[in-house]
Structures are given as C-alpha cells and as structure tokens.
Design a protein with these regions (language model features):
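Intrinsically disordered, low-complexity regulatory regions
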Residues: 1-147
Length: 147
C-alpha cells in the first residue's frame, strides 16, 4: 500500500478492490488467476485493513514517515523470527505429504509476506503494525482463519 504517498485513501482503494473481487468470486465470475480462492481474497483484504488500522495509529501517535532505524529493523526481524518459530512449533510434525506440501507453501507465503511487512514497517516506522500483522499471520497460517 502506498499510504505514505497518497494517504489513507490508498488503503480504501485497495480494500474496495478486494471487496469487489470477493463479490465477483461469490457471484461465480471468472477467476483472474487460476488458483485464486475466496479465502485468498479475504486474507488479502484483512491484511489491508490491518495496514490501515496501524497507519491510523501511527498518525495518531505522530510517528515520522521515515523511521528506518537500526532499532526498528532489529525489532521487526525479532518479531518475524519469533512468529516463524511459533509456526514451526505448532505445525510439526506434519503427518503426511499433502499436509507437508501445504505447510511448505504457507511458509513460502509467510516468508514473502514478512519481507513485504518488514519493508513497510521500516518505511512507516510503526512497529505496532508489524505486531498486528504478525498476530494476524499466525492465526491465518496456523489456524486457518483470522477470526
């Protein structure tokens, strides 16, 4: 999300796009990507909502737009190392090959998402956002839901 450049309207646009995509999937419209699922779109929308909530907190707390400090990098890295270790602890041992493949796929997605998250957290300077998204990611990848 490009909140820094366009303000909170960037989040509203992304959430609106995802909501429209969800409505289309529910209506049975053609998928834009072959393996696109309703659950993927809902997860994406939840992530954008968390990003907006954290951005609102950062605005309320007067967090500077650029807070790329060594301390922030260390905190964000520690957070994602912790969440990755927790996922490892909860998911192993995996009883069969299908579950194993699914777990590895989720870990790859988690890794990509955590890299995006780290970049966003550096830019926005809001560690709170990283904490919120990490909690969301743990629920999503381990328990299969955000609720």
């Amino acid at each position: 999300m490009t909140v820094g450049r366009y303000g909170l309207v960037a989040g509203v646009v992304r959430i609106s796009d995802k909501l429209e995509r969800i409505e289309n999937l529910l209506a049975g419209s053609d998928r834009q990507v072959d393996d696109e699922t309703l659950l993927d779109s809902i997860g994406d929308m939840a992530t954008y909502c968390i990003m907006m909530a954290a951005e609102c907190m950062a605005i309320a707390m007067n967090v500077p737009d650029t807070a790329d400090t060594v301390d922030n990098r260390v905190l964000v890295k520690l957070l994602f190392d912790t969440i990755t270790n927790e996922i490892d602890r909860l998911c192993f041992p995996v009883p069969n090959a299908v579950a194993d493949a699914k777990f590895l796929f989720n870990r790859m997605e988690l890794s990509a998402l955590s890299q995006d998250m780290t970049e966003y957290a550096r830019y926005s300077g809001t560690y709170q956002y990283a904490r919120m998204l990490a909690a969301h990611m743990l629920r999503w990848f381990v328990y299969g839901s955000v609720g």
